[in-house]
Amino acid sequence: WYFFAIFVGVIVGLMFEPLPGGAIGFIGVTLVAVLSPWVLYSPAELAKPGFKSFNAALTWALSGFSNTTVWLIFAAFMFALGYEKTGLGKRIALMLVKAMGKRTLTLGYAVAIADTVLAPFTPSNTARSAGTVYPVIRNLPGLYESKPNDPSARRIGSYIMWVAIATTCVTSSLFLTGLAPNLLAVELVAKTAKISFTWMDWFKAFAPVGILLLVLIPLVTYWLYPPEVKQGDEVPKWAAGELGKMGGFSSREILLAILVMVALALWIFGGDFINATTAAMVVIS
């Protein structure tokens, strides 16, 4: 019950964020380690000859930092942060919107492709969809006087937003590193069933269904929830203007793009000679 109380306290802290999430988690682990005789171990374990609860508690507290899954999640988040800080994620989305935004249907595919390109290196659908894709596409409905919570949303806004939401649900499952819980699930399967998955194993297993869904989402949405605006020049013009403001590719964007391609190549082709976590850490280093 003491452990449960600390666990609930950490969850509440993460919800209300009086401190950064990392600090709250660290405090929770530290409390469990310090109070281990009452929180972590049973009287029978404490009574064992030579058992030192505080040494064992320290080993428990630090065990997570030796977990390869944790480090792979960390590495993927570093890539996601790089997309945001360099502006490469925004540039990719704008380039796709500029190239495919003249027709509403192809605009839907541009949104889907943008999310798919970012997914392997963003293990959070919130960070990917809401943090990178949404800041770009939220500007598009207004170009056609399509407003949220208004009948005019049917002009184009509802279509774009629904495609974005549905797409990120698929890309989160398509790639092992597309969502942090995927990595935790692989770790759980490895421990319980003694079955290991590589990055490529996961992708090949879901690709037949995932790719089909990515192809169908913009099209089926276009049929079932048709936008009133079918085509126009406003979106490509707006995207071209935004790209003009960003200027040419910076050296940081080019470097990040190269590192991303190297990491992806190692994950796809290097499974037989290098661990996915090692590959990610090498690239980040």
Residue ranges and their predicted role:
Residues 12-19, 114-124, 166-176, 265-270:
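Transmembrane alpha-helix interface/packing and boundary motifs in multi-pass membrane proteins
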Residues 15-18, 85, 102, 196:
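Helix-loop interface residues and adjacent transmembrane-helix termini in multi-pass membrane transporters
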